[in-house]
Amino acid sequence: QLYDIGARAAFPSQPSPYGMTSQGQTNLPQQVQPQLVSETISSIKCIYIGQNDLTGYAGVIDGQTAGASACSDPQNYVKALAYGILGGTNLNSYK
């Protein structure tokens, strides 16, 4: 339930141009990504991505990608929510 609700809230039908793609890559400018990792969310290992569910892909904050099974720890998901990483604007607030 938590995962499904979070995914629907974080990934609306019109995703942010700076958000995560369905392949786990970011559309963020390259100069922004190191700041995201080192200054803001260095403790967040994974964020889930998907239009309506979390069975497809998971994005790793450091720019690499992994299958959903690699980021299946609920604590990481809750931390990401707490830090606002999965807000309705995806990563747009950090651009």
From Swiss-Prot:
Protein name, as recorded: Nodulin
Gene source species: Striga hermonthica (Purple witchweed)
